[in-house]
Each structure stands twice: as C-alpha cells, then as structure tokens.
Amino acid sequence: DIAKAKIQVVMGLSGSGKSTLIRHLNRLIEPTFGKILIDKKDVLSLSKKELLLFRQKNMSMVFQKFALFPHKTIIDNIGYGLSIQSLSKDVRIEKASKWLKRVGLEGYEEYFPNQLSGGMQQRVGLARALATDAEILLMDEAFSALDPLIRADMQNILLDLQNELHKTIVFITHDLDEALKIGDKIAILRDGLIVQDSDPQDIILNPADEYVSDFIKDINRARVIKAKSIMSKISKPVKGSLSINQNMVLEDILQEITKNPNKDIMVENNQGKTIGKISIKELLNGIKRPDTK
C-alpha cells in the first residue's frame, strides 16, 4: 500500500523493475495480472476513454530526461496538460505562471527549453506536473541526470512543495542518500519483487536481508538515524540532563554532548514532553556499522 499524501520511494539496482513498476500505475505499460487500486477503484478496469481522463486529472509524471517540447515556450510547456483539459488560454497562462514562479523561474516564460540548463528544465518538468493539480505524482529518476548540487536543490524544492501541497508521490531512484532524504517510506526491489518496504529509519536499523544490508552498508548512519529510533522509553526527565528533540540525528547529538559532557541525554517529543533517554552505548551502537556476514 502507498499512503496518501506521502512520498513513497522505490529503489533498487538497474534492471530490478523500478521504472516498469511506475509505468504500470498509469498503464503506460499494461500489467499482465493483479489490481491497481486508487481510492478503491481498479485502474485496470478503466476503458480507454476513462484511462485518458484519469491520466489528465488524477496522475502526473516527471521524467528523467525532462520530456519537454523543444518547439514550445516554457509557459506553453507548463500549460500543456491544462490544454488537454480544454481550459481557456487565459486560465492556462495564469496557472502555468503561478507554478513557474513557485519553482523559481519567473521571467523565463518566453524562453525555449534549449535555452535553459538541465536543472532549470527539470524545474519546468516539475511545474508542468503540478499545474494539472493531480493528486498523484510519479517521478521516475527525476533528478538522476542532474549535477549533485542541482540535485540537492531540486530535492529541497520538492520537499518544500510537499510540505504545503501534500501530494501522493511515487519517487523512483537508485540513490540511497536521495531516498533517505525525501522518502516517508522506501521500498527496495530485487528482480521485480519487494524485498523490504519500511520507513527510512527501519531500513537502516533493521535491514530485511543481506541484499538490503549491502545497500546500506556505506551510508553515514550518524547523519540519518534519529534520536527516537535508538532511545529507551521513559516518561520522567532526570534532573540536570541534556534535552534533545526526538528528530535530532546522531551527528548533531554528538555535537551537543561535546558542549555538555557528563550529562544524561533525555529525548523530548515536539511538544516538549520527555519520552525517552539515550545512553552512550546506545548512541555508539547507532553509529556503528553493523557486522557483515
């Protein structure tokens, strides 16, 4: 199941079935069996006309290679999905201009794709997908072709927009750092099958098998694992202790400890209530790379 208004990451090695899977969701590739249920309606039961309408209204897609129309201006590229919905030109321009501004490209309305950098073109692709106001966003290796700094910038733009829009996003990637940064849940594929589907913390702390362990073995655990994932539960704080938020990562906890040595570490929720404590042993075990078989 993919949770509504969350980012579901799907990752795996090349050839594991990631891109095939995402194209099954909107039937760009026809599934051979099974069901695709969206709000209890089976996408496989839709007629050609119903499927076309479903793609126009309910689901948008962002591709790795941008897929912009080279002969259309940026504003017309963003408004393309709206033109298919038969909206008037004034409405299309208004909506497209809004999303162009949201992705930081105001002033580029009359440019053509070949006049923009790769990162700028992918911003246009994201704006085009969002302009249709579809509830579901499919992103197939959307940032993989970008330089590291531009990729990080696009990840931040996506997260900022998601905090406001609460879309249901299926995000395909082979980059574990990217998956851990943006995913509410991560599904790891192997030969078309899901090996593990869990939240990022659980993936790192409790890999399902050796295949998943190999995926995560080189990750900097201190930058990923949060206090709430390794704490022991308690309800009353210790007097004179160091209080940290449940979402603080271990790397930042270490920084706090160097400023406040010899203090017990208490973990608080977002309301400031003590919910646990962390011992030095728990902290070190969280940072330590698990033993390989």
Where are these regions (language model features)?
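Helix-to-loop junction immediately C-terminal to a conserved catalytic motif
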Residues: 26
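Conserved ABC transporter NBD signature motif
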Residues: 34-42
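Conserved ABC ATPase "signature" region
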Residues: 41-42, 83, 90-107
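Conserved ABC ATPase signature
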Residues: 112-116, 120
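A short, proline-enriched helix->beta-strand linker immediately N-terminal to the Walker B motif
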Residues: 131-135
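Conserved ABC ATPase "signature" C-loop
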Residues: 191-192
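ABC ATPase "signature
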Residues: 197-198, 206, 277
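The conserved cystathionine-beta-synthase
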Residues: 239-262, 266-271, 278-293
